Regions:
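Gly/serine-rich nucleotide phosphate-binding loop at the start of the catalytic core
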Residues: 1-76
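Stable alpha-helical structural segments in soluble proteins, enriched in small hydrophobic residues
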Residues: 34, 79-90, 363-373
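Substrate-contacting helices/loops that form the catalytic groove of nucleic-acid
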Residues: 35-65, 164-308, 378-414
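Acidic carboxylate diad motif detector
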Residues: 52-163
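Active-site phosphate-binding and catalytic loops of NTP-dependent enzymes
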Residues: 88-100, 177-184, 317-323, 342
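Generic recognition of long tandem-repeat/solenoid scaffolds
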Residues: 128-136, 168-174, 350-351
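Positively charged, low-complexity nucleic-acid-binding target-recognition regions
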Residues: 298, 302-414
Length: 414
């Protein structure tokens, strides 16, 4: 299993900032040159076309441009690999029907990180709140060591990044052997009552098959602050000192919004994997959910992919099954009898014309997610439907949990 730990870094305390910035710029030029050669050189000559082939050209680069000899060789190979990873992601999006262009040339502002892989780094002095990260060709960088890296984790990669706010961060890519992880309960001995289906929606952030719902995180104050700061930025001359100071203010507001969303997602996902043996979620087409104009503003707030990834890696850490199921028809299909009924987005209640079953539309969808996932895990289906076995819930009297409560308490409880 692979996951990340992130720490604040302070290269300025050891005079390493200038060298780190120069090295990142060299990596940026390496990325852009990889892109250039991929477009210009014939892939049939076996010089380019794969990360391995292209990495073999680095010796020629170093002979022609001495700056490439300044940076660590493994880190330079990782930069070439990053281009091909981005290329692969682009191809995957195209295969899935998304409209994609070509990988863009990276400007200095767009490329602000570098990654050491396998070697060229060492974490030292980890006994206190401040540790030291040594990077080959750069030197020592103090980091705010606010949590210990687990003893059973192996550091495979180290990424040094300068944020748009001017702050530096270090991310450790950690690997834990699967044998070190807690065992997930076997499907044939799991109790369906210890499983939950969740619907990721627009009206509520999540709605569980147990009848719990969590409101969207309220970012209205942050959006208003961002609007004011961006308006102030637009009045300043681009590139001036005042413009740069205001740009950092805008970046800090965005960073605060991002952290607030991530904190909410972390606490909600942790609560789910601790409470249940299995969490079932729709494999949503996020762009489809949020493509309408009325929902466009929620795109950066939702970050559904990030939330589902949190569930997946925390499921491994806590021994919880995370299963994604086909979302087709979960809202239309009646959880009681299976008859499908079309509903526009503004209709928030499910009322089946066939059997008369009524529920909140998101609650009905979560029942269907639960039912499909139980079948996928091979648990079979009880004589009763999820709608019949679930705790009786009157949607008109069920209070949705504010996102602020999740942040404050780390749970859906009071």
């Amino acid at each position: 299993m692979w996951y990340d730990y992130r720490f604040r870094a302070y290269p300025d305390r050891t005079g390493a900032t200038a060298k780190a910035e120069r090295h990142i710029n060299i990596h940026r030029q390496a990325y852009n040159h990889t892109r250039y050669e991929y477009q210009e050189l014939d892939t049939n000559n076996h010089k380019v076309g794969s990360a391995y082939q292209h990495q073999n050209r680095l010796t020629e680069w170093k002979d022609e441009w001495s700056m490439f000899s300044e940076v660590h060789s493994k880190a330079l190979q990782k930069t070439v690999e990053q281009f091909y990873n981005n290329l692969s992601n682009l191809s995957e999006k195209k295969e899935n029907g998304h409209k994609v262009g070509w990988l863009k040339w990276k400007s200095p502002r767009e490329y602000q990180s570098m990654t050491y892989s396998q070697s060229g780094f060492e974490l030292k002095n980890t006994s206190g709140q401040t540790a030291t990260l040594w990077l080959s060709t750069i030197g020592d960088i103090p980091i705010q060591y606010h949590r210990d890296i687990p003893d059973n984790a192996v550091i495979k990669e180290v990424t040094l990044k300068k944020e748009t706010t001017g702050e530096w961060y270090v991310t450790f890519g950690l690997e834990i052997e699967d044998t070190e992880l807690p065992e997930k309960p076997e499907a044939n001995i799991m109790n369906a009552e210890d499983c939950v289906g969740i619907d990721l929606g627009i009206q509520n952030y999540v709605y569980t098959s147990d009848g719990d719902s969590v409101d969207w995180l309220d970012l209205s104050d942050e959006y208003e602050r961002l609007r004011r700061e961006q308006q102030s930025l637009s009045r300043k001359k681009r590139g001036s000192n005042n413009w740069e100071r205001q740009r950092k203010k805008v970046a800090k507001v965005k960073r605060r919004m991002k952290r607030k969303v991530e904190d909410f997602q972390h606490k909600l996902s942790t609560w789910l994997v601790k409470k249940y043996d299995a969490v079932f979620v729709e494999n949503l087409n996020v762009s489809g959910m949020l493509q309408s104009n009325g929902n466009a503003r929620n795109k950066q707030d939702a970050a559904w992919r990030g939330f589902i990834k949190m569930l997946e890696y925390k499921g491994d850490l806590y021994g919880t099954h995370i299963v994604q199921v086909n979302p087709r028809g979960t809202t239309k299909e009646c959880a009681e009898c299976g008859v499908e009924t079309d509903k526009p987005l503004w209709v928030r209640e499910h009322s089946c014309p066939s059997c008369g079953f009524e529920a909140d539309r998101d609650l009905n969808a979560s029942y269907n997610v639960l039912s499909r996932s139980l079948r996928e895990l091979g648990l079979g289906q009880t004589e009763s439907t999820p709608a019949e076995t679930a705790t009786a819930v009157d949607p008109s009297h069920r209070e949705s949990v504010p996102a602020s409560r999740v942040i404050e308490t780390g749970s859906l409880g009071a």
